[in-house]
From Swiss-Prot:
Species whose genome carries this gene: Shigella boydii serotype 18 (strain CDC 3083-94 / BS512)
One Pfam family of this chain: Voltage_CLC
GO cellular component terms, A-Z: chloride channel complex; plasma membrane
Location(s) in or outside the cell: Cell inner membrane
Keywords of this entry: Cell inner membrane, Cell membrane, Chloride, Chloride channel, Ion channel, Ion transport, Membrane, Transmembrane, Transmembrane helix, Transport, Voltage-gated channel
GO BP terms in the entry: response to acidic pH
Name this protein carries in UniProt: Voltage-gated ClC-type chloride channel ClcB
An example molecular function term from Gene Ontology annotations: voltage-gated chloride channel activity
Matches recorded under CDD domains: Voltage_gated_ClC (cd00400)
Amino acid sequence: MFRRLLIATVVGILAAFAVAGFRHAMLLLEWLFLNNDSGSLVNAATNLSPWRRLLTPALGGLAAGLLLMGWQKFTQQRPHAPTDYMEALQTDGQFDYAASLVKSLASLLVVTSGSAIGREGAMILLAALAASCFAQRFTPRQEWKLWIACGAAAGMAAAYRAPLAGSLFIAEVLFGTMMLASLGPVIISAVVALLVSNLINHSDALLYNVQLSVTVQARDYALIISTGVLAGLCGPLLLTLMNACHRGFVSLKLAPPWQLALGGVIVGLLSLFTPAVWGNGYSTVQSFLTAPPLLMIIAGIFLCKLCAVLASSGSGAPGGVFTPTLFIGLAIGMLYGRSLGLWFPDGEEITLLLGLTEMATLLAATTHAPIMSTLMICEMTGEYQLLPGLLIACVIASVISRTLHRDSIYRQHTAQHS
């Protein structure tokens, strides 16, 4: 047992450095090509001329597509092993390391050029790759899947500063394939990754700064639970839209570079209306949480961002869909809150409260992982007073969503991009 805990610690350290490496590479490319040192792609887009704002995502998608197509032609074969940590966990615990690194580099290109796709997917993949490399060198074969799970959880903890949610995500996704006793090393890796990441970044701040002054009462619990029903209906709709957009891009029968470039062009066009469509949505989420906008502003940004996410994901842009889903949930919740706020004196607090809860419930509806979704929002915002209501709402959202749409967003996304 001591040996496993020691290896889990090493995996956590490796994962933290893998995530930090990708984050710093992203910041470097943003500084070189966008003259942006703020770390916010929305700020970068705001400061660009309209023609550069239009073309940059398209050129990034084109470059990523050429890289992926060139690698496939160079090797003259498809990857001989998984290039995704979810696939590796469901098979024999092995990666195609070279193809996975190329995929991560392609993700770096589309992320830094403004595509509305999550950077955290590549971060978690690199963390799992680092864990796999170490495991294949120093551990027996039957443990490889465990250490990949530890690496993925550690990567999620370092990326989102949510070690418990990262650990439980792995446990919920792999329920039935991992014994409960295996959860110990996963948690150790996640916590170590968070601590090392805090040391690297010289900060232990929460991912999102939220000032929620309301004390949750009976009325608020009823509203929170209602967001679970809303998310249970919206989650399957979002998954259906993503699947339809992917099929639409595939039906065009374009070469991968042109398909990714087309997705980038759509993002670029949308960014002419609002630069908030650039990136994974992190900075827009923070701005909404700091000062919830008016109803029409939320609606406008939401529609543009939703179309950008659908275009990026549908075109096959390598990256995650976790953080974009958080923004979509926040926007839906705030639209709901603004509508209800017309009848309540504390409309601002209700808007913020329902925005936070819809982030969790839509995440639960799309991932089918309600416990992870609850803890994720609590850990990212520090609003643990929401925990009881969120647990109920997330379970409701997950149950309704599973009834309407069998596959989770990860299973669907993996199938589309494998």
